[in-house]
A protein has these predicted regions:
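An exposed, glycine/acidic-rich loop-and-rim segment of catalytic or binding clefts
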Residues: 1-228
Length: 228
């Protein structure tokens, strides 16, 4: 994957850096000569903005994202005492092996409903069969347009707000983390196109080509909570 490759510096300043990578036709099995750029910019309101852009001379699927692990209490502690809230009424349905079925599943009034703030501990310990099978959360939520994902730490003195123009977000609670870390020591928030999008034409279009480029962003804003 692109995460294991060395990207070149395109530009930088005191508060931003832009990296680029050129993927030749049939690199990793993907058609098209593709140019990709990712920029990271630190903004004045404690916001880290990540911009993704890509263009190709042939039609090819692209879904660049960020796979950071977040822990607002510090990396030596668990994320179980965090809370999470996001505006989404559905997830993309999955088979037993976690591949997408192409259908949607309502989460309204279910254990997976995150429209109201929930503790990650309560989610992980839920008797919901899907959560038990995954041993936590590892699901793609269908974001409501303009929605915000909000994560708060145990003391409620630090809040992470995520904004994006991607149509979905994978929420993963780190249940498969291994040494030197432990399970549930980090939370992943991965804005993306829906999993398996190329195989399901009714999903939002993840293809770029000569007449269509990728322009997506992730904004991560760190806010002080009510106690500060």
């Amino acid at each position: 994957g692109f995460d294991r490759l060395i990207w070149s510096e395109h530009s930088k300043s005191d508060s931003h850096i832009c990296l680029e990578y050129f993927s030749k036709h049939n690199d990793q099995g993907f058609p098209g000569n593709m140019s990709a750029r990712i920029s990271y910019a630190w903004e004045s309101d404690r916001t880290l903005r990540i911009d993704f852009s890509a263009s190709s001379d042939r039609e090819t699927p692209v879904s660049l994202t960020n796979h950071n692990y977040y822990n607002l209490n510090g990396h030596q502690s668990s994320i179980k005492n965090h809370t999470i809230q996001l505006d989404a009424n559905e997830i993309t349905s999955i088979h037993h092996d976690f591949t997408a079925t192409g259908d949607f599943e309502s989460v309204i009034n279910s254990c997976l409903d995150l429209n109201h703030e929930k503790s990650i501990s309560a989610l992980i310990n839920s008797e919901d069969p899907m959560i038990k099978h995954a041993r936590g959360l590892d699901f793609n939520y269908v974001l409501t347009k303009g929605s915000v994902v909000s994560v708060t730490n145990e003391l409620k003195d630090l809040i992470l707000e995520l904004h994006t123009n991607y149509p979905g977000i994978q929420i993963y609670t780190g249940q498969h983390l291994d040494k030197p870390f432990q399970r549930y020591q980090g939370l992943c928030l991965e804005p993306q196109f829906y999993p398996c999008s190329p195989n399901h034409p009714h999903f939002p279009d993840c293809f770029i080509g000569p007449d269509k480029i990728l322009n997506k962003f992730i904004k991560l804003r760190f806010k002080e909570g009510d106690l500060l």
